[in-house]
Amino acid sequence: MKADGGTMERRYWIGVVSRSHIMIGTEGSFVQLNHGKREPLRRFHAGDGLLIYSPRESYPDGAPLQAFTAAGIIRTGEIYQGDMGDGFMPFRVDVDYLPCHETPIRPLIDELSFIRKKKSWGAAFRFGLLQVPEQDFALITGAMECTFPAGFFKDPPAA
């Protein structure tokens, strides 16, 4: 909550996850970022929008993909650890993923305001999690043909 007692304003995020890893996440309704680190997940709040950008099919040496592969809404923002076996206990948050179509990034680059340097656009994703403006989030999810609940967007995208 804000200091004035109001609710948190919804934020919009892009997480960077290989396609093979996010397929596990969508199946289990969770996301883990930056090799299971806790810190990036602390930025999420219930109701935030989340997009997944997959630079590769699989990590670390999979074929290049460069596509948005999943979209959803952060469920509670509560961080917990999952058990992936062999002692790997990554931190996660639950996500309500929505039906979407995988969408390549390249046709969208010129329209995305968070990508300032269009020729070196990949640099925008180097930290594994970035907050983006609602308009960019809506543009990408529109290209993915995602349907968010009524009232999700403060400024709904034009139909």
Specify the residue positions occupied by each region the protein language model found.
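Compositionally biased, charged N-terminal/linker segments
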Residues: 1-46, 144-149, 153-159
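Beta-strand-rich binding-surface signature
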Residues: 12, 49, 92
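Short, conserved, surface-exposed binding loops centered on an aromatic residue
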Residues: 41-45, 61-66
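Short, intrinsically disordered low-complexity segments
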Residues: 46-49, 58
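Hydrophobic beta-strand signal
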Residues: 51-52, 69
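Short, charged beta-turn/beta-strand-edge "cap" motif at the junction between a beta-strand
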Residues: 54-60
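Aromatic- and Lys/Arg-enriched surface recognition patch
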Residues: 64-130, 134-135
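C-terminal terminal-subdomain/extension
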Residues: 119-157
